[in-house]
């Protein structure tokens, strides 16, 4: 089977193109696509590290270097949760809020561009197919034999 015969090939190629474009644009603002995504998902009332890890698809411990970098850049600060002192929440600094707005604007403009070139019916069909692929992936059991 050739890579072009698999669905995941096209998913990866399309996402890689999107991520590369976001990185190219984000670098002009001194951030990366991943940092922009994290900034967009940090809420005014703070966001738990575990929530961010889930969104990024990584373990909480894997985020420590990225969060440290974001602190050093002055984008975020950490604070123990008032209700559960064992839990740490991430908050945006004023500079982080500025960069979050930039990231949101970049995403909005890029999606406006895509929507100008992809019709409503095509977009809805794509979303439906991607949702179906996601569900099938979650349901898939390869049934390995030992």
Please report, for each region that a protein language model flagged, where it lies by residue:
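N-terminal leader segment of winged-helix/HTH proteins
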Residues: 1-29
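Charged, amphipathic alpha-helical coiled-coil/dimerization segments
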Residues: 19, 69-128
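Amphipathic alpha-helical interaction segments
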Residues: 9, 13, 37, 125-128, ...
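C-terminal regulatory/oligomerization modules of transcriptional regulators
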Residues: 1, 121-146
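Short, locally clustered residues in the helix-turn-helix/winged-helix DNA-binding domain
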Residues: 15, 40-44, 104, 131
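N-terminal helix-turn-helix DNA-binding core of bacterial DNA-binding proteins
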Residues: 20-62
